Swiss-Prot record:
PANTHER family: GLUTAMINE-RICH PROTEIN 2. Residues 383-423 are annotated as: Disordered. Belongs to the mycobacterial PPE family. InterPro entries: PPE_C (IPR022171), PPE_dom (IPR000030), PPE_sf (IPR038332). It comes from the Bacteria. This is Uncharacterized PPE family protein PPE14. Pfam families: PPE (PF00823), PPE-SVP (PF12484). GO terms for biological process: response to host immune response.
């Protein structure tokens, strides 16, 4: 625009009727805030990346992450500098407006000059006001020139303030096909894991898990049923499973039964106890040897109840519960408050090492020797002392106690030396 063609009334009116520099100052403050936030983000981002790849994370993955993240840190810093420059330029534009506003002739002076000129012209009958009229016109010309110069200068300053380098978008750190590739890799990894699990189960001997499934199927809760279904799906040979046993001095130990007992009970000690209960220890006639007598109850001087054999031919069916307290009326109490104390008759140390020449005392639990399973008879009653046992007691209960409320303690006596009467 050619401001020299416009009279001072127009230029001065435009300058004085505008919104002023307040909007430019507000924009400068906003850009300062953006620059500060970007600078803080760049410093924090760079610190996190450098700390992550230097201290806890090293290797090709860390190098790839650093290569993808470092350009973004640079972009944040560069954008922060651009925002700061934008704020400076907005502030410069506001200053340019202030300078132009101060140099512009006020519209009131222009109006006064025009009013005085009209008065002089109206009173100039004989030409006596010619000099005053010329001076007024000269003053008006100066106003015209001053406003034009101010507007030209303001135009140049505004153009310089608005010249900003363009903002660039951030560098693309990932490829467009990255999410699809990640999803495909995850799906492939899951399929590979399932295939590996199926291959591992297929290498097991045929029917290795049949005892587990048949034992748990009878009293399976919803969780156990779900696990059985998963096992059957992963390995179709489960249905024809055969037990795996380990030879021991007292017979063959079922590994699967031991595993089930160890994971199905809340105590490892009770798990081992309940697993070993089917292998009773006794004498084979006069041979003096030890061997399993599975399926026969212990012989003891006490009236031992017939056990309630579980699905393995050993421990009672396993059951477990979580979050259920014992009740005394309507009051929830710890389980130890309701445990009936066993009726202690006699308890001594285990018998010494068995000698083939020693006769078996009929009250000594078939002459069970000290050793790995010497105290297993007492330990097998640990669960019965707290849960009431899995079987029923033969005979009539005494002292008005119900069956299973106070299970007796098995009596273990020392084996007397040869020739001495039993104690």
């Amino acid at each position: 625009m050619d401001f020299g063609l416009l009279p001072p009334e127009v230029n001065s009116s435009r300058m004085y009727s505008g919104p002023g520099p307040e909007s430019m100052l507000a924009a400068a403050a906003a850009w300062d805030g953006v620059a500060a936030e970007l600078t803080s983000a760049a410093v924090s981002y760079g610190s996190v990346v450098s700390t992550l790849i230097v201290e806890p994370w090293m290797g090709p993955a860390a190098a790839a992450m650093a290569a993808a993240a470092t350009p973004y840190v640079g972009w944040l810093a560069a954008t922060a500098a651009l925002a700061k420059e934008t704020a400076t330029q907005a502030r410069a534009a506001a200053e340019a407006f202030g300078t132009a506003f101060a140099m512009t002739v006020p519209p009131s002076l222009v109006a006064a000059n025009r009013s005085r000129l009209m008065s002089l012209v109206a009173a100039n009958i004989l030409g006596q006001n010619s000099a005053a009229i010329a001076a007024t016109q000269a003053e008006y010309a100066e106003m015209w020139a001053q406003d034009a110069a101010v507007m030209y200068s303001y135009e140049g300053a505004s153009a310089a303030a608005s010249a900003l380098p363009p903002f660039t978008p951030p560098v693309q750190g990932t490829g467009p096909a990255g999410p699809a590739a990640a999803a495909a890799a995850t799906q492939a990894a899951g399929a590979g894991a399932v295939a590996d699990a199926q291959a591992t189960l297929a290498q097991l001997p045929p029917g290795i898990l049949s005892d587990i499934l048949s034992a748990l199927a009878a009293n399976a809760d919803p969780l156990t049923s779900g696990l059985l279904g998963i096992a059957s799906t992963l390995n179709p040979q489960v249905g024809s499973a055969q037990p795996i046993v380990i030879p021991t001095p007292i017979g063959e130990l079922d590994v699967i039964a031991l595993y089930i007992a160890s994971i199905a009970t809340g105590s490892i000690a009770l798990a081992i106890t309940n697993t070993a209960r089917p292998w009773h220890i006794g004498l084979y006639g006069n041979a003096g040897g030890l061997g399993p007598t599975q399926g026969h109850p212990l012989s003891s001087a006490t009236d031992e109840p017939e056990p309630h054999w579980g699905p393995f031919g050993g421990a009672a069916p396993v059951s477990a519960g979580v979050g259920h307290a014992a009740l005394v009326g309507a009051l929830s109490v710890p389980h130890s408050w309701t445990t009936a104390a066993p009726e202690i008759q006699l308890a001594v140390q285990a018998t010494p090492t068995f000698s083939s020449s020693a006769g078996a005392d009929p009250t000594a639990l078939n002459g069970m020797p000290a050793g790995l399973l010497s105290g297993m008879a007492l330990a097998s009653l640990a669960a019965r002392g707290t849960t009431g046992g899995g079987g029923t007691r033969s005979g009539t209960s005494t002292d008005g106690q119900e069956d299973g409320r106070k299970p007796p303690v098995v009596v273990i006596r020392e084996q007397p030396p040869p020739g001495n009467p039993p104690r």
